[in-house]
Amino acid sequence: PLGNGFAMEPDTPTLLLAGGMGIVPFVGYVSEHPKPWNVTMLFGHREPLSCYPVDSINEHVPLDSLRETVPGDLDNFIFTIQERMREYAEQKGLILACGPLPFLKTVHGFARELNARVQLSLENRMACGVGACLGCVTRTTGEWPVADKRHGLVQTCNHGPVFWANQIEL
């Protein structure tokens, strides 16, 4: 409801990466996407699929669900994320990610390594929601628009919660 949402580029192959409850923002995204056949989702989770709104996504886009049930599953999921991101980076696709901070840090690292076009939806605590308290700041990189440097910090509630991975530090 606050700030900026994910980019929607209908003619660009788009990979959605969701970790746990990070699947929620993608429900609206896939239902509004004009070319859902150009979108794929990779979803990692610990709880059974019945805990997540997968039916409303699965009717629009292909969903690869990887459930963590034993310790080795997490390594497999991370490897799968990296391989999928590599595929989409090579074809200049768009990669969108939402999930817990450790998940986003992993995606952020791969985005830099692959020089991929990636947007991350951050789950910062937003106390006031209007930019007055500065409680939700995110550190920026040198890629942040020059006219809007803000001393290396931006408010997630106003300038996010979705950011290009190359413009922020995690």
Across the structure, where does each feature detected by a protein language model lie?
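Local cysteine-cluster metal-coordination motifs and their immediate loop/turn environment
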Residues: 25, 101, 123-161
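Short acidic, glycine/serine/threonine-rich loops at helix termini
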Residues: 54, 131, 168
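Iron-sulfur (Fe-S) cluster-binding modules
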Residues: 92, 166-170
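FNR/FR-type flavoprotein reductase catalytic core
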Residues: 1-127
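Glycine-rich, flexible loop/turn motifs
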Residues: 2-4, 118, 153, 158-159, ...
